[in-house]
Amino acid sequence: PSATIEDFAPMQIGKYITYRLDSTVTTNFGVAFEVHTYEVKFLVDAQITDNLGRPAYRIFRYIRNNPGQAWLPDNTFTATNTGTSFEFVENNLRYIKLKLPIKDNYSWKGNSYIESTSINTELMYLYDWDYFYENVYQPATVGSMVLDSTITINQREDSVGVPITPETQYAEKNISKEIYAKNIGMVYRNFLHWEFQRVNNSYTGYGVTYTLIDHN
């Protein structure tokens, strides 16, 4: 039988997933990058109605620097299972994370709700991404967890002007990939976006890597 959205994005109040978060940020006015490591917990808090009037779930994110510390509230997200897709709203941007049918090489425009072409947008790099599945229903090891049925969503992998040489005036790199596990949800995410401009010899951008630690 073919998989449902619920199989790979189960939403129940009280469900949580904890991750190691490796956060890549620019430092020293953009001349370099550094990585900060945290733990984060995503907790399904309540069933709500989203801004389109559909049943959805509110998800709280908590963060701490290391396992001995108390969790601190950090962010709030909205997740909607439409029956044929799984939408996730983060910082007011609505992503179509999963879409039926779940099968290798099936492709969809996962960022189609995001306004990325207006004149002053800083989101141009999100324009026209083709998400597609691979390694459907395959086992995977994520962190220390062995997972028996996972799907990989490749969202983007492109670059311009890389590797950077002394002649490079502009460069850009985008990487985005997620793995979902059956009956758990997202277990891995790797995202990186940066731009380099020779005119001020600096980088802008950021990256995040989420790696599953634990879940209920």
Regions from the language model: what does each represent?
Residues 1-216:
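Conserved functional acidic sites
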